[in-house]
């Protein structure tokens, strides 16, 4: 089996022809489902209507990713205000993110040059990487009685948003799932903060919560940017 491709930001170049072909193939795959069947929707305007449905799905995903990032920012700011004032949790927090080893691009000019396949791969890499820590984050927050029900509800909603975004990318780009998993295995990235999150030492526990909320906000911003650029590509507006 060939090794999984390497996705370093400085090596990426966006090929508009390849990107357009990928979108066309995705649309044509839906058309092929109608062959040999009685299909009322397979009239002369089927391509236009399929493309509209395709782009509408991306618009919905872009709206969801926007809310995804905004909610992560709200949660970080609220936790920071309530628990981190006068603390030194922010020191070295950028080095604590478990997704650092992926080197997922965050500069917009680099992301804009990235092809559709790699953008979708990076989106899934980040979302998959948060499944375990996000589950434990939501679970452990339930034990913090001083947090408002609204905050706990936001954390649960955020986890649901992540699942919906994953499902969307998986449906649109199913062939990238194995390469994504290979990339994650090769990066040897894993979250090791569970002992701190469950510690009886309140300061240690709060420090880990702070790290998670900080890194979650950073990575959700990347996911939002990737999906918005994928969306503008489908609309041919960028």
Swiss-Prot record:
Mention any one GO cellular component term assigned to this protein in its UniProt record. extracellular space
The keyword Zinc-finger belongs to this UniProt entry's keyword annotation: no
Question: Pfam family of this protein, just one?
Answer: Hormone_1
Q: Which residues are glycosylated?
A: 70, 92
**Entry keyword set:** Disulfide bond, Glycoprotein, Hormone, Secreted, Signal
Question: What's the PTM story here?
Answer: N-Glycosylated; the glycans terminate in either N-acetyl-galactosamine (GalNAc) or N-acetyllactosamine. Terminal GalNAc on Asn-linked glycans is greatly reduced prior to parturition while lactosamine-type N-glycans remain unaltered.
Q: Which molecular-function annotations from GO does this UniProt entry contain?
A: hormone activity; prolactin receptor binding
InterPro entries cross-referenced by the UniProt entry: 4_helix_cytokine-like_core, Somatotropin/Prolactin, Somatotropin_CS
Q: Which family does it belong to?
A: Belongs to the somatotropin/prolactin family.
According to UniProt, the name of this protein is Placental prolactin-related protein 1
According to its UniProt entry, this protein's organism is Bos taurus
């Amino acid at each position: 089996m060939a090794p999984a491709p390497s996705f370093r930001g400085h090596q990426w170049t966006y090929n508009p022809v390849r990107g357009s072909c990928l979108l066309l193939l995705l649309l044509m795959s839906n058309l092929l489902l109608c062959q040999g069947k009685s299909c009322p929707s397979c009239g002369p305007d089927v391509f236009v209507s399929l493309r509209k449905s395709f782009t509408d799905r991306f618009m919905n995903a872009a709206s969801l990713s926007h809310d995804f990032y905004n909610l992560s920012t709200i949660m970080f700011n609220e936790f920071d205000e309530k628990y981190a004032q006068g603390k030194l949790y922010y020191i070295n927090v950028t080095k604590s993110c478990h997704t650092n080893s992926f080197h997922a691009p965050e500069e917009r000019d680099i992301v804009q040059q990235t092809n559709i396949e790699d953008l979708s791969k990076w989106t899934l890499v980040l979302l998959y990487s948060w499944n375990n820590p996000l589950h434990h984050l939501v679970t452990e927050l339930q034990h913090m009685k001083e947090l408002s029900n609204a905050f706990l509800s936001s954390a649960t909603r955020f986890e649901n948003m992540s699942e919906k975004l994953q499902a969307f990318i998986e449906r649109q780009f199913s062939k990238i799932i194995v390469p994504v998993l290979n990339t994650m295995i090769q990066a040897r990235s894993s979250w090791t903060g569970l002992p701190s999150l469950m510690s009886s030492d309140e300061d240690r526990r709060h420090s880990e919560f702070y790290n998670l909320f900080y890194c979650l906000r950073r990575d959700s911003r990347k996911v939002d940017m990737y999906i918005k650029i994928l969306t503008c590509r489908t609309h041919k507006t960028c």
